[in-house]
Each structure stands twice: as structure tokens, then as C-alpha cells.
Amino acid sequence: MNLQQIEPDIFISAQISVENIKKLAQMGFKTIICNRPDQEDPHQPDFSTIKTEAHKYGIKAYHIPIVPPTIERSDIETMQTILKTAPTPLLAYCHYGTRSMHLYRLARL
């Protein structure tokens, strides 16, 4: 798991595993945002699996699936709301981290 810090309490990463969630909890993360649609890759865990594991550790989990190359206005608005209201530290992830970074930047405009 390679975390890229983009603000003091905001991080971006590539796909996380269910096993990473315990480590994220130990690091103090309070919120996870998944920007991958389910079934994008046959080897990725479904969001529901990530969410269930996150909740075991008291981590909030949100799903804003982005299908390249389009980021919808509603996705940006949802991200803006989460960034304003969700507890931090916060991690947003997708396959490589690129979609999460683009969505974050658009939400901060």
C-alpha cells in the first residue's frame, strides 16, 4: 500500500486490499473513499467487502465509482460533501490513484 499525502489529512492510493484496512485503522484513518466500480478487475475486492471490513474498525466507507474518462458533476458534488463532512484522516483510492486524484482536484475547485 503506497499512500500519497496531498493535504495534512487527505491521502490517495492505488487499490487497497481487505488486509490493508487493519493497518489503515492502526494509522488512524477514519474515512475511505473507493473510486472504482465493482468488477472493473476480476481480482479487486468488491466495495461491499471493503466497507464491511472498514466498519469493523470504525472507518466510514463511501463509494463514488468513476468510469474513465468521465467524471460526472454529481460525483464531484458527492466528493465535495464527503470532504466537508467526513472525519479525517481520509483515504481515496482507485486502480492506480489517478481517478481519485482528479476527482479530489475537481472537488477542491
Where are these regions (language model features)?
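Cys-dependent protein tyrosine phosphatase-like superfamily
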Residues: M1-L91, T98, H102-L109
